[in-house]
């Protein structure tokens, strides 16, 4: 027994040509199609243009206009207009096959079929034939009880040579699978309600296809065996328009195309297949399927529901994928996968790459509440899936989920399996609360690649917004809003290669997780050479930048930047920076060089920072820690000092005069060599070992560094660096403290002006000697008091004098 699943009411699809708004709608569709085709820019433009030229050489502006002209040619070729009832057709349960055959004859005829249900064993239409009923559900043509399982309800009569100019309108076609106690398609491309095979110029309008053994409507080639390296549409159908049709209960797909081209499918409904073409639980029965070898196909304002896939653009492993397919204004309601693009057998890295899966657009399409379906248990709900296809454009896509439906953490949109060059603009997603992620970009060896997502809105949907897979480095995410409740992460990527700009998020625990780093605001992440606020700059490398400059400034190398500069300033090599300079240049393939605030200089040495006017005037050497200056070094402080360690390991107070005990210092007494004074005002200080342990690098017998030549890991250049002491323990580096932070080390002022502790004997102009580290009056010497800055008091036990040491 055949079970009908929510068959649509035929009255919903009644002929609407009598309504004035219908004409307006057709004009709107025509304008959209015309603009779309005229302004399309694909490699197949020439072929599409040729398709708009009639057999008489007349150029039409639109392929549909050529179809219209061919329709009028069909009317002009008709020499008879008959009613099938005049040939004995009666809707009373008898076999009317012969009556239809006689009425149709050899073609060039318009056959009218009155209201009623007519049983036939298949109708074959020759060229130049129009068959017209009274409307869907009013005129019904149904297969007779004795009809073989392989028969169609209607097809063309010459599969070998092909047919042309056939028009079918205004009827329901019932394949009657319950005949003979239940029949199914015996295999092959038989058993459909209506098939055009090798037909040029065909029209199918206002037709209802019911319970087909295979497909409701099939636009095809006589055979399905054309390889990708052949002219695979040579024997297919072309210039076909399917309009305002309904299919349901199909054994496989509702409306499908194979090895055919220039097909229009508009204003149609296809849903609720029976799936009997497959084993139970694995029925890939789809609403509209643009299958093997189809190309130049337009789907306009159609509706699908209850299918495994609402619209599938695909091919099987051995056959060419459908190309140049345009889906406009389609609504998928409760199909499992609303829109699915794939080339089977070309998904894994071990599979051959598809050479034919190209050029699909989806414009203003909607996926509403995709759901699981027992027809195919293993297929999980998605709004959009793209696999293996390249050059795909999705614009104005809307995905609406049921917040209470369990999507079992599956993604809403999945780009996967070696798909590439995909643009998604203006996508809106909401309501998939129990999905796993709204947009999933698969990584790994079978990754998708070169993805652009822009002007998108995700609202109260999955816990994750956009997930980027590993090894995926070419993703642009621009201008989006992501708002949800109790979300986990808005954008997730295992690397920082995605370009992210202008994205806002709300309601996620983490706005972004990029290479393990989490953000509470979605960051701006830009890659590629950037030219910003410059009238004439060049960022040559993908990791270089020129910013706020003029005069053909150029950043050539990796991680190079030229900022606030002019006069043709340029960088080369790796990790180079020029800032606030004119006509400054970093040259060669060395690494880590910087020019600041300079005019007309050239820097070549690695690991240096330099500046100057007309020539380098100062240079800092990061390898050796040296600084070189052509001019003076100024300080508000006075004197020169060096670090010395106290012999006791204890702090010696500022202003104390010290002497040497071996290599360490103690407070000086009368007769001691006065080394210097503990100072806090030395302008120049040496011996600090500020950054690393003083013994980290090997030295020669005179204390100079021992050098070695090593290869820079990044640039490959040979550089000369101090040789590390084999006894150096890097594990202790974290606990190392500069001498400035340790009590036992002191800055000892050796020459210049310093503050010295003095006793009550000292006056301005006196010489000093030392007693227990405190200055006392001497008759001569090299220490002379310039002025008393703090008079001696017995309470403190000292005064303070500014003293010059020579």
UniProtKB/Swiss-Prot annotation:
Sorted alphabetically, which InterPro entries does this protein's record hold? GH28_Enzymes, PbH1, Pectin_lyas_fold, Pectin_lyase_fold/virulence, Peptidase_G2
Pfam family, any one = Peptidase_G2
Region feature Disordered, mapped onto this chain: 1-23
Q: Where is the composition biased (Polar residues)?
A: 12-21
- The entry's keywords: Repeat
Q: Where would I find the PbH1 repeats? A: 199-221, 237-259, 260-292, 294-315, 419-441, 448-470
Q: Which PANTHER family match?
A: PECTIN LYASE-RELATED (PTHR31339), PLASMIN AND FIBRONECTIN-BINDING PROTEIN A (PTHR31339:SF9)
Q: What is this protein called?
A: Putative phage-related protein YobO
UniProt source species:
Bacillus subtilis (strain 168)
Q: What is the lineage of its organism?
A: Bacteria, Bacillati, Bacillota, Bacilli, Bacillales
**Coding gene?**
yobO
């Amino acid at each position: 027994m055949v079970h009908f699943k929510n068959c649509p009411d035929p009255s919903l699809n009644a002929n609407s040509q009598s309504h004035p708004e219908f004409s307006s709608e057709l004009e709107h569709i025509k304008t959209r199609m015309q603009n779309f085709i005229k302004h399309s820019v694909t490699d197949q433009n020439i072929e599409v243009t040729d398709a708009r030229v009639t057999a008489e050489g007349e150029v039409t502006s639109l392929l549909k206009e050529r179809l219209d002209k061919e329709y009028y040619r069909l009317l002009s070729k008709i020499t008879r207009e008959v009613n099938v009832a005049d040939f004995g057709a009666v809707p009373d349960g008898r076999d009317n096959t012969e009556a239809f055959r006689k009425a149709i004859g050899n073609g060039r005829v318009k056959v009218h079929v009155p209201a009623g249900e007519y049983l036939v064993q298949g109708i074959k239409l020759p060229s130049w034939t129009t068959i017209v009923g009274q409307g869907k559900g009013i005129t019904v043509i149904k297969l007779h009880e004795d009809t073989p399982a392989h028969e169609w309800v209607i097809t063309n009569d010459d599969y070998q040579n092909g047919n042309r100019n056939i028009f079918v309108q205004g009827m329901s076609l019932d394949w009657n699978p319950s005949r003979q106690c239940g029949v199914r398609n015996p295999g092959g491309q038989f058993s459909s309600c209506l098939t055009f095979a090798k037909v040029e110029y065909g029209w199918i309008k206002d037709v209802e296809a019911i319970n087909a053994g295979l497909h409701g409507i099939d636009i095809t080639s006589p055979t399905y065996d054309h390889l990708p390296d052949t002219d695979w549409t040579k024997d297919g159908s072309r210039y076909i328009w399917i309009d305002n049709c309904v299919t349901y209960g199909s054994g496989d797909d509702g409306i499908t195309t194979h090895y055919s081209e220039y097909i229009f499918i508009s204003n149609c409904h296809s849903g609720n297949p029976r799936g009997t073409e497959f084993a139970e639980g694995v029925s890939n029965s789809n609403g509209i399927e643009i299958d093997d070898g189809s190309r130049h196909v337009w789907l306009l304002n159609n509706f699908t529901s209850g299918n495994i896939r609402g619209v599938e653009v695909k091919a099987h492993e051995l056959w060419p994928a459908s190309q140049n397919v345009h889906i406009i204004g389609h609504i998928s309601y409760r199909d499992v996968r609303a829109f699915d693009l794939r080339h089977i057998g070309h998904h894994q890295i071990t599979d051959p790459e598809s050479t034919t899966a190209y050029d699909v657009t989806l414009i203003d399409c909607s996926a509403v509440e995709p759901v699981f379906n027992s027809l195919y248990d293993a297929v999980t709900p998605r709004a959009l899936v793209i696999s293996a296809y390249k050059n795909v454009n999705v614009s104005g896509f809307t995905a609406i989920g049921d917040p209470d439906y369990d999507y079992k953490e599956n993604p809403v949109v999945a780009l996967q399996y070696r798909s590439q060059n995909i643009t998604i603009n203006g996508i809106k997603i909401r309501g998939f609360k129990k999905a796993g992620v709204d947009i999933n970009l698969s990584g790994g060896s079978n990754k998708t690649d070169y993805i652009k997502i822009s002007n998108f809105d995700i609202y109260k949907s999955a816990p994750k917004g956009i997930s980027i897979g590993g090894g995926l480095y070419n993703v642009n995410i621009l201008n989006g809003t992501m708002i949800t409740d109790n979300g986990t992460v808005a954008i997730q990527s295992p690397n920082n290669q995605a370009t992210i700009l202008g994205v806002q998020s709300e309601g996620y625990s983490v706005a972004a997780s990029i290479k393990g780093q989490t953000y509470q605001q979605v960051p701006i992440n830009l890659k590629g050479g950037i030219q910003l606020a410059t009238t004439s700059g060049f960022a040559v490398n993908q990791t270089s930048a020129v910013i706020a400059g003029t005069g053909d400034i150029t950043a050539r190398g990796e991680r190079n930047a030229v900022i606030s500069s002019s006069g043709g300033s340029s960088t080369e090599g790796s990790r180079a920076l020029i800032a606030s300079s004119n006509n400054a240049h970093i040259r060669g393939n060395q690494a880590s060089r910087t020019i600041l605030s300079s005019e007309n200089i050239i820097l070549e040495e690695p690991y240096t920072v330099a500046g100057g006017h007309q020539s380098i005037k100062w240079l800092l050497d990061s390898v050796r820690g040296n600084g070189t200056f052509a001019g003076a070094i100024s300080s508000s402080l006075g004197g020169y000092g060096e670090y010395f360690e106290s012999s006791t390991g204890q702090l010696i107070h500022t202003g104390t005069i010290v002497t040497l005990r071996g290599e360490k210092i103690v407070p000086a007494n009368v007769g001691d060599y006065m080394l210097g004074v503990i100072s806090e005002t030395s302008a120049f200080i040496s011996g600090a070992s500020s950054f690393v342990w003083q013994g980290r690098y090997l030295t020669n017998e005179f204390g100079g560094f021992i050098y070695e030549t090593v290869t820079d890991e990044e640039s490959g250049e040979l550089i000369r660096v101090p040789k590390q002491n084999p006894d150096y323990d890097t594990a202790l580096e974290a606990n190392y403290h500069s001498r400035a932070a340790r009590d036992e080390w002191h800055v000892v002022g050796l020459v210049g002006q310093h503050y010295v502790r003095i006793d009550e004997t000292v006056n301005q102009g006196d010489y000093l000697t030392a007693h227990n580290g405190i200055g006392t009056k001497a008759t001569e010497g090299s220490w002379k008091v310039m002025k008393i800055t703090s008079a001696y008091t017995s309470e403190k036990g000292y005064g303070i004098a500014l003293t010059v040491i020579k």
